[in-house]
Amino acid sequence: MTRRVRLLSSCSILMTALTIFAAGSPAFAQATPRDIDAFAKASLVYIATVRKDGNQSKAAPVWFTTTPDHVLLINTGPTSWKAKRIRRGSPAMVWIGSEDGPAFIGKAEITSDPALENRIITDYPEKYMMARVGLFKPSQEKFDKGTVVVIKITPVRDLPDFTSKPGTTAPSLAPAAPH
């Protein structure tokens, strides 16, 4: 075998191994059926992030939409506490519908993906009367100017009995230990 063929074969094996590893990792977790049902019924989600001291912030109610694969999308100002903490690597704790609704912890990231921006621009006015009449309505201009950003939250771990209490130690993104 030539050096080039060996290199390509090695790269192919490595990519296959990485794909298998990633598919089993928490970052590829999905929303539970309970969460999917709750997303369909809820008008708000409550989001908390992790402060520098490792404790949970206060849960804030926010408008939301989801992607077809049930990834949560919200928008916020680029200098909000949520955005600052997420840039620092904070996960997001999410309660669907109310502060004691179904909860999960997710990998949060700020993205400038035009498709996700467009989803928010399109979905919010359909879901929220205030956006329909022009109040707090997201627009491409706001995204382009950087006055709002998209936060994408991918569910990682279900939190079946977790309640929102600011100042408590935040749960880990790591999967729960089997019983």
Language model: regions and residue ranges:
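N-terminal secretory signal peptides that target proteins for export/translocation
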Residues: 1-6
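Bacterial N-terminal signal peptides
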Residues: 10-23
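C-terminal edge-of-domain segments
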Residues: 28-31, 142-179
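Short N-terminal segments immediately surrounding and downstream of signal-peptide cleavage
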Residues: 29-48
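Short, P/G- and charge-enriched loop/turn segments at secondary-structure junctions
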Residues: 33-35, 50-51, 136-141
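Extracellular/periplasmic catalytic domains that process cell-envelope and extracellular macromolecules
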Residues: 38-40, 56-58, 65-66, 87, ...
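Short beta-strand segments
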Residues: 42-78, 92-95, 103-105
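Short, structured beta-strand-loop surface elements
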Residues: 79-150, 154-156
